[in-house]
Each structure stands twice: as C-alpha cells, then as structure tokens.
Amino acid sequence: MTVRDPAAAAGATVGDLTESELLEVVLTGLAPAVRDGHWPVGTVAPGDDAALVPAPRGGTLISTDAMGEGTDFLHRWPAGPRTRGYDAGWKAVAQNLSDVNAMGGTASALVTALTLPPTTPVAWVRSFAAGIVGAVRHLGAPDCRVAGGDLGTGGRVHAAVTVLGDPHPGGVLCRTPAAADRDRVLAEGADLVHAQALPGGPRAAAPPGPGWAAAGLALLLTDRAELERRADALPAADRPSPRELARAVRAQLRPRPPLALGPAAVTAGLLTLMDVSDGLGKDAHRMAAATGGTGPAPAPWLDEAWLAEAAAPLRLVAALAGRSPEALVTGGGEDYGLLGLAWPETELPRGFTRIGRLVPAGARTPAGHRPLPESGWDPFGG
C-alpha cells in the first residue's frame, strides 16, 4: 500500500511513503518552528535546496552532534520505557544548543539529517519533528530557525543535528583562558564554577543537577525484573519514589541545558566555559589541560561540601541503580550544565556556584577539597 495522504498515515511506516510524502510529514511537524522562526526579507526558509539565514558580524558559531540507535538510545530499554520520537528529537537538538551556549552564544539556526529504517512508524517521525520544535521553544531558543535538513534510509535510526549560533557581543568563551589571563591561572589557579539550572524558573522545569542523567541511563539499561528484585531487597525507606525515578529518566531522555547562562557568563567576565556532556571529572580535566603552559597541568579539586550537597538527593536512586551517588555526580555525563573558571573576586551570575579550585601543579591544596577524578563517558572506551 502506498499512502498518498501523510496526514492519514497513522498506522503507516516509512517504507509505505515516498520521499516527498515523508518530507511533508516532517515539514508539517516543523511548521510551528518555521512559522515562528523570524525569516526576514532576503532569507530563505526550508523547502529549497538550501536555506539562507542571516549572518552576524563577528563570525558564526557552528556545532554538530549525532545520535544513533543502539549507541545513544534504544527504542525500548531493558527497564521497559520506550524512546519516543519526541525524546530523540528533543535530545538531538538540546545537546547542540548546549554547545553554542557553552561558547556564550545564542543559537540562530539548525538543520537535521535523519536516517530511518523503512519499518519506522510514521508517527515516530512526526513525533521526532515535534521534539525538535519542543526543544527550541521550551529550552529558550526563540531565535533558532529550523532551516531544514535531509532524509535518508538505513538499517537504524540516526540523527545528526548542526546548529549555527551568534556570538555574544562581548566575545566567545572557550575552554582555554585568554592569553592575558593564562599566566595568572597557571601561577595562582582559579575557581571552578558550575551552573545547571536557570534561576527563578519553575521548579518542575528545572534540571535536577549533575549525576541525574547518568542515574537515569543506569536505570534504563537495567532489566526490569532486576530493578524489581533490587527494590524488593531495599527497606521501604530506602526505595526511591516513582517521582524520583521519573526525574532521573527524564534527565536522560530530555536534558535541559541552561541556555540563558552562557551569555550571562560572558557578561560576568568568566575566564573559560564548556558544557558538561561527558562527566564533570572528565570535562574538568579537559579544561585543566587546555590552560596551556609547558609544565604539568593544574589539577581540579572539588569542594567536599558541594559534592555532599549535590550527591544527597541522588542517594535513593543511586542505590537502586547500583551506583555511588558521588560517582554519579563526578563521572556522570549528559547533564549539559556549564563548567568554567573564574577569579575569586568575580561576581558570578545568578545560577552559577563555586564548586572547587583549579590548583597549579605543586601548589598547596585547598582545605575541604578532594581531587576530582578524571571519570566520565568516552564513546571510544579510552
């Protein structure tokens, strides 16, 4: 059967549609973002061979990332939940918006390349498009134009998103300090600062903090029967509530990078910035290595009081997941918060907090701190 009306394709698969019909499904799903995407005279919205988007002076930020079925998500997890198209579309966009945010910029446009097996339900594709729109709208990227993309077929779902961004008028923040600041960082060190949640937002919409996405992944990858066995073995007071479990799973499937805080970091004069995608420890060590210099790199040390505060809410979920809450905080990835360096005298923007110190090699270690292990996610296993 060939479906000629994509709107009537509720039970159809990708293999039932022509390319034009499938493209119509996607474009219909993206229509709200295209309609609200501020396409001024002289630009070209999606539908042609290429889109034409406005370009600012001072360059364009570009980031690309991919999500693959079987590597980055499963349609059905061992624990039981499914990855809906909305979840995959949301996360594919969120992780790229996070990269632009980490440079202090504002996303201006995105394109998506989507590879689909012929057996993929059309409803899943429609939901994927809705997830793209949802992420752009609800994460706070109103100026990000959905500029088009590409569709193809393959053995597994694969989504690659490229985001363009406008740099902040005050410049960009990198993981390497500016040359004028590098010598002082190497000699004196600097404060490690972190941001996860937007200040003043609704509590229900706030991201839960470092470690929760990794806890969600650990739960999703555990067989449902095993989770039930573990829960039965725990005292009732030590079992996480359904709300806590949902919070962890949601942190993994629908991350919420704090998009307003990257530009705020530029305005405040932070020295460096990057997003926490592979784990607080691994990314902090990357930042330390990027400080430059010919001698040993400075080392990140974590404030023990901050670690205890961040780990405490994870205790019950971590126990069910079979993980240490402290290890989830320091080594869990995909939280998409912000990690940076600041001088002790710098007034931090709301939403940022000091979590430790970058300590020069051979310098006295700060009291009440512990070394931050270089733990986290490496897709190549190294």
Listing of model-derived features with the role each one plays in the protein:
Residues 52, 96, 104, 146, ...:
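Residue-level signal for inorganic ion chemistry
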Residues 2-101, 142-144:
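N-terminal glycine-rich phosphate/pyrophosphate-binding loops that anchor nucleotide-derived ligands
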Residues 228-254, 315:
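A short, charged helix-loop
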